[in-house]
Structures are given as structure tokens and as C-alpha cells.
């Protein structure tokens, strides 16, 4: 295991809150990655998918509130003016951001847990608790999934980079697929971490990916497994841990991972309410942000890496729930070069 070097804890003034976040658990936030876009999507257990326009100076307007009725577990932008979402009612839906009109693309047999978008092919990729990964054409409605493949167990985490789909499952398997040839996986491997997978994310270059787990650990794995030298480059490390007042180590799930689009550094968010930004190349922690009120449920950098969306929602990790429950929030943090550039 590798140990990251510590950095100064920062309570920054350059943060502002998004008004009117989802009222119940925030399942995902995502900045649109279109060049020049300022849009941010958020899904929640209150059954809403919300789209905001986020200005550079903290000015925010709400462009869309799509009320689904059932808890939403995921969302993703699907092109310039569309957002897709899914949840516990098994359905995959698509909404037009300008008009607010929505349509159902199809469904899974169980809850839709993950969704991502491939702009190169205009395909929405969904992963469900029914152990399936499905592809949907964002340009045509009502034709159902254009392709589907079964994995070993429920999909818990997913990422898409160009045509490659990365899937983490309940049974701790990691699958990689080419969306143009979905029938057979490019790779199947065991997770390098011993406990349940919470997030998977590709490096922006696609040469490697990150896996996080419920046991306060993160692993860096390389796609190319050929040769002893490549195997030496992979590593894992402990994070999101703290000492209790009696000296007991508290280990927190690492719920979310997000990569900086310019520098290839990445942020992690945990049940300890902490956001860390890491340098995976030099194996150092660049910065630790101040402690938030409750668990970090989702993170997303904007298209140029100058802003980080931080969603906080209590995830019911504690044996005794706090009363009252902490408020949900979405914070936009301005990210500077020294906070995100490799050391």
C-alpha cells in the first residue's frame, strides 16, 4: 500500500451554494462537458432531476426541474440540450432542457443505478441492479435499447471514456467493454480492493482508472496489464479515515471520485464529509478541503477544471442516525491551479 503525503487543510472563501438542491438525498451531480457550457445537473431521491446554469461569479439560475415521482439514482447530460436520468422505477428517461418535455427510452428489470453518455456516438449507457448494461440512442425515441449485455451481478459504478465502458459490480468485478462491440468484454478482473466498490473513474488519458470502496481505500489500476513493469505501476492507498476521541480509527466509505480534465489529478469524497484532491503521478495529496456538514455523495469538475461541484447528503452510514438529519447541499468550489496541478 502507498501512503500519500499530507497537505494543509483549507477552509476556502471561494465557495458558494446552489439554491434549491434536491430535497432528499442527492444521488449525483454532473457538470456538462461541452466546451463553454455552464450547466450542472443534479438527481435526487425526491424524484427530481434539476439543471442549473452556474456563473463564474456565483450567479446561479435554475433552468429545469423535471419531477419524476420516484427516487432517482443517477443522471447524465446526453448532448448539448438533453439530460437523461433513471432510478428505482427501472425506467430510463430523457428530457429536453429547453422545453422540459420528457420521454421514456425504455427500462431495466430492476433499478437504474448508473448512467453516462458517449458524445462520440450519441449513446447513453445505463447500468442496473438487474446486472445489465444497456445502450440507448439519444437521437431516437421509443425504439428501446439498441444493445444490452449481462454482467456478473448488480452494477454499482460506471464510467465511459470515448468508446470504452468501465463497470464495477456488486461482486467486486471490474468489466471493460467497447460500446461498438458490446457482446464480449475487453477485460474482466477482480477489484484490487477487498470490500464493496463505490466508484470507478477513468483517467482522462484512458491509460488507467481509479476504484474506491466502502473501506476507506482507493486503488489506481492500469488498463494494460502486460509485463512486470506495468504491474508495478498500480497501487492502492488508505484515505478518508480519522481517529475517534478514544483513539479508535474510523474508516469511511469513499463514495465518489472525479478527475480534473486538464491535469489528470482527481478528487475523492467520503462519508467523513471531506474532499481530497490527489496527485496520482507523484502519489501525493495536493489539498484537503474543509469538513462539510455530512457525507460527500457526488463530485464533478466543470469542463475546464476551474469549478468543482460538491454534493453532500447523509447516506445513513451511522448506527444511530443524527436528529435532525443534516441538510442536503450542492457547493460550487472555485479550484485554483495550485489546488489541482500535480506537485
From Swiss-Prot:
Result of knocking out the encoding gene: Viable, but with a reduced brood size. Reduced bub-1 expression and localization at the kinetochore which may lead to the delay in the onset of anaphase during embryogenesis. Defective synapsis with increased numbers of nuclei that contain asymmetrically aligned (clustered) chromosomes. RNAi-mediated knockdown results in reduced survival as compared to wild-type animals in anoxic conditions.
Biased composition (Basic and acidic residues): 334-343
Alphabetized GO MF terms: ubiquitin binding
Location in the cell: Chromosome, Centromere, Kinetochore; Nucleus
SMART domains attached to this UniProt entry: WD40
Stretches forming WD repeats: 21-62, 67-105, 107-146, 150-187, 192-232, 249-288, 291-331
Cited Pfam families: WD40
Location of region: Disordered: 322-343
UniProt-listed InterPro entries: G-protein_beta_WD-40_rep (IPR020472), WD40/YVTN_repeat-like_dom_sf (IPR015943), WD40_repeat_CS (IPR019775), WD40_repeat_dom_sf (IPR036322), WD40_rpt (IPR001680)
Alphabetized UniProt keyword annotations: Cell cycle, Cell division, Centromere, Chromosome, Kinetochore, Meiosis, Mitosis, Nucleus, Repeat, WD repeat
Example GO biological process: mitotic spindle assembly checkpoint signaling
Keyword Phosphoprotein annotated: no
GO annotation, cellular component aspect: bub1-bub3 complex; kinetochore; mitotic checkpoint complex; nucleoplasm
Functional description taken from the UniProt entry: Has a dual function in spindle-assembly checkpoint signaling and in promoting the establishment of correct kinetochore-microtubule (K-MT) attachments. Promotes the formation of stable end-on bipolar attachments of chromosomes. Necessary for expression and kinetochore localization of bub-1. Plays a role in synapsis checkpoint signaling inducing apoptosis in response to unsynapsed chromosomes and thus controlling chromosomal segregation during oocyte meiosis.
Assembly notes: May interact with bub-1; for localization at the kinetochore and the onset of anaphase.
Similarity comment: Belongs to the WD repeat BUB3 family.
Protein name: Mitotic checkpoint protein bub-3
